[in-house]
Amino acid sequence: MKVQETRSHVHALGEEEKVMTRKQKAESKAHEVEHSPKKAKVEKEDGHINGKSETGVAEEYDEFCKATTEHLPLEQMRDILEANGLDSSGSDLEITRRCQDLLFYGALDKCSVCNGSLEFDGRRYVCRGFYSEWASCTFSTRNPPRKQEPIKLPDSVQNSLASDLLKKYQDPSHRPHRDLGLAEKPFTGMMISLMGRLTRTHHYWKTTIEKHGGKVANSIIGSTCLVASPAERERGGTSKLAEAMERSIPVVREAWLIDSIEKQEPQPLEAYDLVSDLSVDGKGIPWDKQDPGEEAIESLSAELKLYGKRGVYKDTKLQEQGGKIFERDGILYNCAFSVCDQGRGLNDYCVMQLIVVPENRLHLYFKKGRVGDDPNAEERLEEWDNVDGALKEFVRLFEEITGNEFEPWEREKKFQKKPLKFYPIDMDDGIEVRHGALGLRQLGIAATHCKLEPLVANFMKVLCSQEIYKYALMEMGYDCPDLPIGMVTNLHLKKCEDVLLEFIDKVKSLKETGPKAEAVWTDFSQRWFTLMHSTRPFNFRDYQEIADHAAAALEGVRDITQASHLIGDMTGSTIDDPLSETYKKLGCSISALDKSSDDYEMIVKYLEKTYEPVKVGDIEYGVSVENIFAVQTGGCPSYEDIIKLPNKVLLWCGSRSSNLLRHLQKGFLPAICSLPIPGYMFGKAIVCSDAAAEAARYGFTAVDRPEGFLVLAIASLGNEITELKTPPEDASSLEEKKVGVKGPGKKKTDESEHFVWKDDIKVPCGKLVASDHQDSPLEYNEYAVYDKKRARISYLVGVKYEEKEEKGAVIDTAE
């Protein structure tokens, strides 16, 4: 076996221990805390605790720590912890801190949320337990519950030099009370060095840092970080900057100080890094710690490294030698994994492959790390002479990182998630669209060689370009270049859907409040971002976030996966006309409308009447029509069938360009879930609007991508329409009855201007006016159809968003 490349993974624990050592020292010297109302039972009016001042207690604890460190060996500390039913594992620092806290202040009671163990982390008491196999508990407190019972001292300690000191605190009534209060300061225990011309003077920052618990150091040695101005970087820096880089001391922007003070928590230093790309190796900043704007730039320029189940990971460079994924007995030895547990600071991916190159040379590739942080990833590429040995090592690694057996997963998809272990991303056998679709250089050539009508060829060029899918995944935060999120199996998508629906049902009937309710949301968040690996994970807090970042995102990923299968691999020659090939796979007919036709003029009028400018910041965007395409798709009922149905209305539907290939092949799919939020409040329905403004708000993505498409559909609302003025508590009855539903918005189209188009199709074309429903959660009227056979995509309106000079009514939207 030859090892070609190795990198050691730099664990966060080491850094945490350094920080906590400083924090513990600071905490031991003095507890600079405010008096808390919670201390009323043990504090006297003069601020004394059990007859001692806070400073006195802190000094006593400091002396106690010195004595126990000197006279109590680590093994005896472990014995004490075990005798009292506490965890005796961990680093020397953790064991010492845990034992000293127990002996001086008394045994900690269990976490009130998950019944796990509480532990002091240098700033507060945090829980080390788990809500579930997916999520660690994030409960924390500054005033932990203590057991009012004597400490158990094992025989090995009874006759030790420290026994008299320890027995002094055995009786609960003699113990000092430790309450960290609410006045913990963000820079407690930190030494901060300043350099260069900052926006405020060094004197100002020295005073401010000291006010918030820190100290300012003139020397870089021993500093937590160096705060410098960007100008220092541009000038190449000084000896102080060079020394900080040599000593691997973080160099951060001034914004780190500002944000840490504002949030009253020290912010992650790597997110404010100023110089990592100047160092020889490059430290690498994980994407989830970067500014979203900087992360977006990296994402859009990044190449997808793993495109699917047969994809050889790009960094191995073995695909250039003709490398292919090793296959035996129907199993492809290529696995990708994800784990997200924000309570433990985890948001990692893992890739594991067996790759065979010509002449039957076999390689095992393994990589584990964080997106964007390659220098700190654990990575190795090994050549194996023995196939069975390589297979055994692959299986061993799978079991090590997941806690599950390999074959039951690959053959039957049997898998049980284990705490802090990885979960497989079930890749499909295909080529993800960020790899297989047309790159910028190929777009023009592909359209030139296309046999389709020029306007249709240009339309297909847009839908077959990498760009729209890269942007869509970047905007959703599912743009990890190391995992093919746009090429996962239907089984994986179904697992995501099941987890989402189960959570929504749970939260709708939730009776818990406070930390226990937060735990339900936190648990779902970790499940979700493990299954759907994100470069920007967070804890969901409300229904709107669920709608935007889970439901809509899952629908988007589902549609991008379908686009990946349709587009396949266009990376080769474009002379073979890949655009026409994809067009054939759609099984639909697309034709550009003549701009002088009645249909074209009617649609432009309908758009102009029911549109309101999209607002981004202080800028408003109008819209102009570029082209209109008539569509006949096999995924929808035919025109002949739809016109036989009652109460037909021409309505607008919002869509992103990245959703369109799936729409054109499969037709509309209903919303994935029911939420009391616009777009999802009608349950699993196809939702349309009589206002182009609503569709435009959904279709607008960003000012640097002004082109988009609005969908016009014919929907049969049926003879009976149910009007809902508030979100229904349960939409399942509506789904079962399959009746048409209308949700009145704050604005409606002027009914006096409505007209009937051909074949008795109503067109609610009228200027937008205020309705009688100003308390509605909807801005515009929305209509819901529950039967796919009652909605037909008829037109795609290609639009361009343009900055407006004059002010008008606006739609608030996020860029």
Curated annotation (Swiss-Prot):
Biological process according to GO: double-strand break repair
Catalytic reaction equation(s): L-aspartyl-[protein] + NAD(+) = 4-O-(ADP-D-ribosyl)-L-aspartyl-[protein] + nicotinamide; L-glutamyl-[protein] + NAD(+) = 5-O-(ADP-D-ribosyl)-L-glutamyl-[protein] + nicotinamide
Enzyme Commission code: 2.4.2.-
Superkingdom, natural source: Eukaryota
Location of region: Disordered: 1-52, 726-749
WGR domain ranges (all copies): 322-422
Domain BRCT: 182-274
InterPro entries per UniProt: ARTD/PARP (IPR050800), BRCT_dom (IPR001357), BRCT_dom_sf (IPR036420), PARP1-like_PADR1_N (IPR049296), PARP1-like_PADR1_Zn_ribbon (IPR012982), Poly(ADP-ribose)pol_cat_dom (IPR012317), Poly(ADP-ribose)pol_reg_dom (IPR004102), Poly(ADP-ribose)pol_reg_dom_sf (IPR036616)
Record: residues binding Zn(2+): 111, 114, 127, 137
Major enzyme class: transferase
Compositionally biased spans, kind Basic and acidic residues: 1-51, 726-739
Chain residue ranges for the region called Zinc ribbon: 106-150
PADR1 zinc-binding domain mapped to chain residues: 39-179
Function according to Swiss-Prot or TrEMBL: Involved in the base excision repair (BER) pathway, by catalyzing the poly(ADP-ribosyl)ation of a limited number of acceptor proteins involved in chromatin architecture and in DNA metabolism. This modification follows DNA damages and appears as an obligatory step in a detection/signaling pathway leading to the reparation of DNA strand breaks.
Family: Belongs to the ARTD/PARP family.
Name of the molecule in the record: Protein ADP-ribosyltransferase PARP3
Originating organism: Glycine max (Soybean)
Gene name linked to the record: PARP3
